[in-house]
Amino acid sequence: MTVTRDIAATRERVWEVLANGWTYSGWVVGNSRIRAVDSNWPAPGTRILHSIGTWPAVINDETVVHSCVPGEELVLLAKVRPAATARITLRLSDLPGGQCRVAMTEVAASRPLSWMPDSVQLLGVAPRNRECTWRLAKIAEQHVPEAVE
């Protein structure tokens, strides 16, 4: 259940985007707004309070940092109450030419979705995560200093 994308930005630049919780609704599909971000995000245990859906039919929920290795890996527990919790792992690695590869893995971390076979879960999350990594790439690439006049 891993989606990978090569990004034309450094690993440090991609990490800057991930480490700024206020960018979350810009690259995470389904999030419509950010309501608050803990000041020491993305330290383990910190949260982003966000809304899912289109106004006025929004659900207010949160995403919590499970673990973090700055510049390398971010593991999130994204809650979508009352339905489920997803465990999302983002791993960054260097590529030649100052580029970065992002690997995004999402698995159900609570019932009832965790009862579904991995292959069925993949059908639901792979297209969404491809779009998430595409959006993340666009945000990271947009701010490459050589590309800004």
Describe each model-derived feature in a short phrase.
Residues T2-D6, N60-E62, R87-T89, T105:
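Well-ordered beta-strand positions in beta-sheet-rich domains
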Residues R35-P82, R87, W134-E149:
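Glycine-rich portal/gate segments that line the openings of hydrophobic small-molecule binding cavities
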Residues L77-E131, A147-E149:
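Beta-strand/loop substructures that line and gate deep hydrophobic ligand-binding cavities in soluble
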Residues V17, W27, V58-I59, T85, ...:
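Alpha-helix N-cap/helix-start motif
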Residues T2, R35-A36, G53, P117-V120, ...:
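Conserved short-loop catalytic and cofactor-binding motifs
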Residues A8-E12, S39-P42, H66-G71, R91-R101:
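A short, structured loop/turn motif at beta-sheet edges
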